[in-house]
């Protein structure tokens, strides 16, 4: 029986680990969604339900307080419910009329682009996924990985292309045609180059989310697709005997 080459061993181990990861990923997320009512975990899909208006953002010791006019949503949400605000999972602490209040921790202010919200500015909102809901986008946790900056915005006849500058650790976990959440919006990656990636926005997305009002230089919240994080973790953890990227390319990987 012939010995396996280093590349064949790499291929076998990678496929094995990816299979395990995908299985664990599905089981884990299924249990997280089922346990939503017990508040063990919440998930979102990146499909924006409505736009809310900032009434007031008050910075205070340990974080901030955010007041939003959520309109008709005030009849549906409950105290303690989790809502994604521009992609950031926040808990409803009070509802007075159509205005809902949220506390923002210092860590969240550091990671996300919520601290610069201005009065009357619009934000994307999405309620947590419920058992039985359709998954129109992709699994979004509401835990932001960091902030990106709009580098370029090009308007075409029937769509808009927008590119974002991010840290390289973000693009290392992205693939073309993969998913990414930008300000809580589930979008498909069109192109990736070093520390920049781009997405295409259809007219509906431009009119029903905040991205239609964004301009070059504006900050946005970025959440990388969970699968990309898992794959990077596996590749970082495993030792493949010094096989180089060039060797893998030669073998067709």
Label every model-predicted segment.
Residues 1-42:
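Intrinsic disorder/low-complexity segments
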Residues 41-253:
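Conserved loop->alpha-helix
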């Amino acid at each position: 029986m012939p010995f396996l080459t280093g590349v064949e061993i790499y291929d076998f181990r990678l496929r094995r680990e990816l299979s395990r990861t995908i299985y664990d990923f599905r089981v884990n997320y299924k249990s997280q969604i089922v346990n939503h009512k017990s508040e063990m975990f919440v998930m979102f899909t990146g499909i924006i339900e409505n736009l809310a208006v900032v009434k007031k953002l008050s910075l205070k010791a340990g974080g901030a307080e955010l007041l939003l006019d959520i309109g008709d949503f005030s009849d549906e949400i409950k105290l303690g419910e989790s809502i994604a605000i521009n992609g950031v999972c926040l808990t409803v602490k009070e509802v007075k009329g159509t205005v809902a209040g949220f506390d923002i921790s210092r860590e969240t202010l550091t990671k996300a682009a919520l601290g610069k919200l201005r009065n009357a500015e619009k934000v994307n909102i999405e309620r947590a996924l419920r058992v039985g809901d359709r998954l129109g986008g992709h699994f979004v946790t509401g835990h932001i990985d960091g902030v990106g900056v709009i580098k370029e915005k090009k308007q075409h006849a029937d769509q808009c292309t927008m590119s974002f500058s991010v840290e390289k650790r973000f693009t290392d976990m992205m693939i073309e045609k993969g998913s990414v959440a930008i300000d809580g919006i589930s979008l498909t990656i069109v192109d990736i180059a070093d520390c920049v990636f781009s997405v295409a926005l259809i007219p509906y997305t431009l009119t029903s989310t905040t991205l239609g009002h964004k301009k070059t230089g504006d900050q946005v919240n970025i959440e990388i697709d969970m699968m990309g994080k898992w794959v990077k973790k596996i590749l970082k953890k495993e030792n493949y005997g010094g096989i180089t990227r060039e060797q893998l390319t030669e073998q067709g990987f």
